[in-house]
């Protein structure tokens, strides 16, 4: 057994404007090459666009999008007797949030358009309304888990 101390899980501080932990996670996920001010600018512009388009609080729209995009189950590769099985496992809360943030950013970036803020805002709005590529990815993940339900007894 290891004798090393287990480090505590560190969480980023809440952001300055919305005082939200989720927004700071989004900012740190958009971050490239350490340019945090640019990442903050993109997120806050996207939230302004959401406010103009939906006439709702952008934080509630964003939280709804995260809830809609969070997967319940996923598949993990498990090697048993020389063959690899895709074993369905439940997703923990933090991982589900992380996956949904990752998918929203990825599919927002893949949208056609100029500004990342506009693309991100549109993806968040679509995800909050249960449409878009992020929701397709979640459903695809659930279908994979459903198809491999027979291997559920190979749990970790």
Swiss-Prot record:
Gene3D superfamilies the UniProt entry points to: Ribosomal protein S7 domain
GO molecular function: rRNA binding; structural constituent of ribosome
Keyword RNA-binding belongs to the record: yes
Single GO cellular component term: chloroplast
Main location (coarse class): plastid
Top-level taxon in the UniProt lineage: Eukaryota
GO BP annotations, alphabetical order: translation
Keywords from the named record: Chloroplast, Plastid, Ribonucleoprotein, Ribosomal protein, RNA-binding, rRNA-binding
Family as reported in the entry's similarity comment: Belongs to the universal ribosomal protein uS7 family.
Role this protein plays: One of the primary rRNA binding proteins, it binds directly to 16S rRNA where it nucleates assembly of the head domain of the 30S subunit.
Subunit-level organization: Part of the 30S ribosomal subunit.
Name used for this protein in its record: Small ribosomal subunit protein uS7c
Lineage, top ranks: Eukaryota, Sar, Stramenopiles, Ochrophyta, Bacillariophyta
